[in-house]
Regions:
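Negatively charged
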Residues: 11-200
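Classical eukaryotic N-terminal signal peptides for Sec-dependent ER targeting/secretion
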Residues: 1-9
Length: 200
């Protein structure tokens, strides 16, 4: 039966009934798409409407540069992107479900959620094994409190300000392998973090 459904889906896709997921080729294309939806200013004149779950339905129905609908952000195929640097920086109301994003090629997550004050979506299962830069990733992400203790961070070289001002974050990171980290300056600056790190 699964073969039948697969063939049906392929037919619908080719017939234009089902749209392929938005698949940015690189960081620039992804940033351009995210930047179009003014998450940090929703509700003000000229900005897109945002629902309580942090999604941007009007944006999902709008078109990318190729004329195809962007679709729901959580369904985007970001598997070719290698950098998430500053992707949602200052997106103060962003809290969409991006748990399904395929992140295995990403090497840079610097400032990804910097000042994304409402972000607390589940990203616990992200594959971050290629990431080397976590500087300021959750800086002032003041609501974030997801269990990312099982992230594979063995290639990370900087944890500078990673959780600075992340005042809600309280999960055990003792399993993180930090042997390649060269700077931990202000990692938990102004964050009431109180979990064991004796294995670091």
């Amino acid at each position: 039966m699964s073969i039948v459904w697969s063939l049906l889906w392929l037919w619908l896709l080719l017939d234009g009934v089902v749209q392929a997921a938005f698949a940015p080729a690189d960081k620039a294309a992804l940033q351009a798409a995210v930047g179009t939806c003014e998450w940090s200013n929703c509700g003000t004149s000229g900005c897109l409407s945002e629902t309580s779950d942090g999604s941007c339905p009007i944006f999902a129905a709008s078109n990318d540069a190729s004329g195809n609908p962007h679709g729901v952000i959580g369904e985007w195929d970001v598997s070719r992107v290698t950098s998430f640097e500053s992707l949602f920086q200052q997106a103060r109301s962003f809290n969409s479900d991006i748990s399904k994003w395929r992140t295995s090629r990403v090497t840079n997550m610097q400032s990804m959620f910097h000042f994304a004050r409402k972000f607390n979506a589940d990203i616990t299962l992200w594959n971050v094994s290629s990431v080397t830069n976590l500087e300021s990733t959750f800086f002032y992400a003041s609501t974030f409190n997801q269990d990312i203790g099982n992230w594979s961070v063995s290639r990370v070289t900087t944890l500078k300000s990673t959780f600075s001002e992340a005042v809600q974050f309280q999960h055990n990171l003792n399993n993180w392998i930090t042997s390649k980290v060269t700077t931990m300056e202000s990692t938990f600056n102004s964050a009431p973090f109180n979990q064991p790190l004796h294995s670091w």
